[in-house]
């Protein structure tokens, strides 16, 4: 039987891995330069955590979660998103004792049972961060500013930040009533999911992928904001304008998770076609209380690594790739192998990437393998070289080679490589 990867998953290797490392390392640098700490949460959680946070009527809970019973009969779900686990960890570990304005970032796999397509897999990966404590629109501004900084640091330019405010529980009551009236007139035209959600969670109709055209003419949340939410949204836009962070007001935007309040945003890249979203986020001031804690304001963002990499490729952005096979040490004989291992250790201490042959191949086979793996240089050590107290350094691109005194080989090779 030939085993194959599960549908909706990917193996990542070769040049592709450098795109992943570039995105992840850039994200870490941006977060840590802004005082955001890393947090790591389990890949699976109690199912109820996501039902309560994401929303029982959301597509994620209704159709997309990987849920199973463990041997103790508990309902367990592979995490479909990263915010709820961070909130759970914050509450369970009493991190509130550290004070307000805490910041945590995460990088890792998420799982949703969707139809696999370009950049949207069943196991996908996200970078994200959460800022816990501040209620001020200054925090909303900082989140969007940091997302913009991260994407620009990657080299991306062909994206737009879509922005909206969906209000708070106070002003959302009137908005729900307006939506009820609007959708009530066209209820017979809606899909079965929307007909059900009309009774249970009217806001989810705005996020329907089947009946999306109806949302274009639906009442807009910004027209129903209370004074506090309207002032919050206005101030956020003032900050963005002052710092020249470009955005597009999009009053059809609600995001697909029930926990959002007030600010929501989504980043869309023009090179990705209809599935253009590469990141998104917003404020979730009621989530801590919903999950059993005290009322704590919070907000955050998540970006899809696969989607961001597609955007990098769409813009033709060159990323740094390190040659992990830079120097290859080819040896002939046991004594030569032992000396090759010692030389490899000396070169690695100087920060070079070095392979040593361990296949007992002929010299021609070793050099062919070195070229195939992309090595720039080969160091050749045999009985004759040992007798003379030298090694041979060959440039595999030009074919030029030079004899080097063994005692100075590590210094010479390191200096030669540094000049390339």
UniProtKB/Swiss-Prot annotation:
UniProt record similarity statement: Belongs to the class-II aminoacyl-tRNA synthetase family.
Primary location group: cytoplasm
Species of provenance: Thermotoga maritima (strain ATCC 43589 / DSM 3109 / JCM 10099 / NBRC 100826 / MSB8)
Localisation per UniProt entry: Cytoplasm
PANTHER family for the chain: HISTIDINE--TRNA LIGASE, MITOCHONDRIAL-RELATED, HISTIDYL-TRNA SYNTHETASE
One GO BP annotation of this record: histidyl-tRNA aminoacylation
Subunit record text: Homodimer.
Entry-linked Gene3D superfamilies: Anticodon-binding domain (3.40.50.800), Bira Bifunctional Protein, Domain 2 (3.30.930.10)
Swiss-Prot/TrEMBL keywords: Aminoacyl-tRNA synthetase, ATP-binding, Cytoplasm, Ligase, Nucleotide-binding, Protein biosynthesis
PROSITE patterns: AA_TRNA_LIGASE_II (PS50862)
Taxonomic lineage: Bacteria, Thermotogati, Thermotogota, Thermotogae, Thermotogales
Descriptive protein name: Histidine--tRNA ligase
Single GO term (MF): histidine-tRNA ligase activity
EC number of this enzyme: 6.1.1.21
Assigned GO CC terms: cytoplasm
InterPro entries xref list: aa-tRNA-synth_II, aa-tRNA-synth_II/BPL/LPL, Anticodon-bd, Anticodon-bd_dom_sf, His-tRNA-ligase, HisRS-like_core, HisRS/HisZ, HisRS_anticodon
Catalytic reaction equation(s): tRNA(His) + L-histidine + ATP = L-histidyl-tRNA(His) + AMP + diphosphate + H(+)
